[in-house]
From Swiss-Prot:
The keyword Endoplasmic reticulum does not apply. The gene is rplB. The keyword Ribosomal protein applies. It comes from Nocardioides sp. (strain ATCC BAA-499 / JS614). This is Large ribosomal subunit protein uL2. Residues 43-53 have a biased composition (Polar residues). InterPro entries: NA-bd_OB-fold (IPR012340), Rib_uL2_dom2 (IPR014722), Ribosomal_uL2 (IPR002171), Ribosomal_uL2_bac/org-type (IPR005880), Ribosomal_uL2_C (IPR022669), Ribosomal_uL2_CS (IPR022671), Ribosomal_uL2_dom3 (IPR014726), Ribosomal_uL2_RNA-bd_dom (IPR022666). One of the primary rRNA binding proteins. Required for association of the 30S and 50S subunits to form the 70S ribosome, for tRNA binding and peptide bond formation. It has been suggested to have peptidyltransferase activity; this is somewhat controversial. Makes several contacts with the 16S rRNA in the 70S ribosome. PANTHER family: LARGE RIBOSOMAL SUBUNIT PROTEIN UL2M, RIBOSOMAL PROTEIN L2. Residues 268-278 have a biased composition (Basic residues). One of its GO terms (molecular function) is rRNA binding.
């Protein structure tokens, strides 16, 4: 993938860029692998906003992605097409299995039309093949990693992301996550070899607010520019700092306020955050 930049013919075009989509081989999805995706606008079943800054955007169909691949062990497949998916930053690959079934997977880097892929403990170590961590050599770059055996891929699924198998001892493997975090994962968990493709996606300059609206993202208004009735940071004469520690519109402290999860016990070294990133 490469980035195509526009000439500044209008203010919205100035500095904006798009993906060139050269790797895409088909523009219409496989109909049997799509489902309707109704718009919620960030509302729940009571009509109340539960997720702010969502709404509008282009109509989409959801593509069913195979994040497990267990039931296709030993069944080879051929990459029929590399396709665009509006629901994720990565590209997706349509697989035609020799038994006649078709499935989508996340397309790794360098996976091309006509490539043979397979899954299972005896699969070769090459991009697109899915194996248990106990069968993958230490040092291999992987993506679409499970956190629990049989739970489906959860880690390193977006464009350009990958994890690395750093060590393996007994029933646990050590992974270096995309964030730099180090954690233990069961060696029975599956992962796909290679890194996710479309890495240049992060370099796209969207150019104008309207392109974000096409994606279904609405404006994020700062609390300090609101009125007191709308936000705890609102009001005041002139420009103010808010006058208190950052809080949500409902007065709850913002930032890292979540309790630890049970799986946090598997973390060896946390990712660097804030000032520690430097």
């Amino acid at each position: 993938m490469a980035i195509r930049k526009y000439k500044p013919t209008t203010p919205g075009r100035r500095g904006s860029s798009v993906a060139d989509f050269v790797e895409i081989t088909r523009t219409t999805p496989e109909k049997s692998l799509t489902r309707p995706l109704p718009k919620k606008g960030g509302r729940n079943n009571q009509g109340r906003i539960t997720t702010r800054h969502q709404g509008g955007g282009h109509k989409r169909a959801y593509r069913l992605i195979d994040f497990r691949r267990y039931d296709k062990d030993g069944v080879p497949a051929k990459v029929a097409h590399i396709e665009y998916d509006p629901n994720r930053t990565a590209r997706i690959a349509l697989l035609h299995y020799v038994d006649g079934e078709k499935r989508y997977i996340i397309a790794p880097k360098d996976l091309t039309q006509g490539t043979r892929v397979e899954s299972g403990p005896n699969a070769d170590i090459k991009p697109g093949n899915n194996l248990p961590l106990r069968n993958i050599p230490v040092g291999t770059t992987i993506h679409c990693v499970e956190l629990r055996p049989g739970g489906g891929a959860k880690i390193a699924r977006s464009a350009g992301n990958s994890a690395q198998l750093v060590a393996r001892e007994g029933s646990r493997a050590t992974l270096r996550m995309p964030s730099g975090e180090m954690r233990f994962v069961d060696v029975r968990c599956r992962a796909t070899v290679g890194e996710v493709g479309n890495a240049e996606q992060s370099n796209i300059n969207w150019g104008k607010a309207g392109r974000m609206r096409w994606k279904g993202k609405r404006p994020t208004v700062r609390g300090v520019v609101m009125n007191p009735v709308d936000h705890p940071h609102g009001g005041g004469e002139g420009k103010t700092s808010g006058g208190r520690h950052p809080v949500s519109p409902w007065g709850q402290p913002e930032g890292r306020t979540r309790k630890r999860k049970a799986s946090d016990s598997q973390i060896i070294r946390r990712r660097k955050t804030g000032k520690n990133k430097r």
